[in-house]
Amino acid sequence: MGVVTYDMEIPSKIPPTKLFKAFIIDGDNLVPKVLPHAIKCVKILEGDGCAGTIKEVTFGEGSHHKCVKQRVDAIDKDNLTYSYTIIEGDVLADKFESISYHIKIVACPDGGSICKNRSIYTTKGDCKVSEEEIKLGKEKASEIFKALEAYLLANPDYC
């Protein structure tokens, strides 16, 4: 078993609290609305949205994958942090035990924010994570983030 970690930062014009509410708190409803080709729906299978909650994410027709189950590991609305782990699904295939994400949204002096994301891939056996897989993961995350940002900019009264 191996562990591969990468960090990514995405700047945004959206203030941190509004971005956290849209991306994390309302994300299960907003992402499928804004990007139905990427995410078809998100269902809570167990829990109330707090730590320990299990969600099923069904991907849209534009995705190479069908669905995943993810566990909410932590959510802190005051510090604008959120952590979750993919625990099941075809994304993991025979290569990964799990994939964890740790997100923190911080304020910028210009009134916007930066979304800091740490991704941790825990591999099965001697499997390796290629640079191409990391690049694709970053591109997908950036696509979703930028689409949500564009939606919020076009709909300033949201949240």
Predicted regions mapped to residue ranges:
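Beta-strand/loop substructures that line and gate deep hydrophobic ligand-binding cavities in soluble
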Residues: 83-143
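Hydrophobic pocket/interface hotspot
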Residues: 19-23, 55, 72, 115-117
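Hydrophobic ligand-binding cavity/cleft-lining segments
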Residues: 1-50
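C-terminal helix/juxtamembrane-tail motif
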Residues: 1-2, 106, 132-159
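Glycine-rich portal/gate segments that line the openings of hydrophobic small-molecule binding cavities
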Residues: 30, 40-94, 155
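Hydrophobic/aromatic beta-strand elements that line small-molecule binding cavities or substrate pockets
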Residues: 8-10, 68-74, 99-107
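Coil-to-beta-strand transition motifs
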Residues: 3, 63-65, 79, 110-114
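Short, intrinsically disordered, mixed-charge
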Residues: 21-29, 77, 146, 150-154
